[in-house]
């Protein structure tokens, strides 16, 4: 923490202090942060910080280690964070399904998407829509980062249920853009998570 810029250090201290009364991590704060003489283990630190602070810490580690794989994962996680924030604030992800972005698309993600979006122009179009890009990036990041078979199995079950819900309301079949997006997401789930 001592290597942070003053503004980032103050923000981190504030975020940690906010958790001092938390039912879930207040005891960690009392044990490791209140007592200035103790060192806080990384696992406890990660339990107490926000997702944004976690990514800042992850970036620090990537720069310190000069590791390209960690850096690539970091940029995937920035996109995951955007989708997570939208979901946390109960935003309707498909409200404006045609909204585009100008972000550089991860080359590995493009290659993986080529397995189920054969046409290069169709792939560019789908990955160019921000909501589709964020959802596909989140699924791809899970594939690359999650090593727990139990968590992966649970996610497979959740995604199988999601596939069933996509066209539960027939209104979605009438909108070509939503139908095309859902079809791509179903193919991504089937390809990456082996759900049939």
Put a short name on every predicted segment:
Residues 45, 55-82, 89-196:
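Polyanionic, low-complexity intrinsically disordered segments
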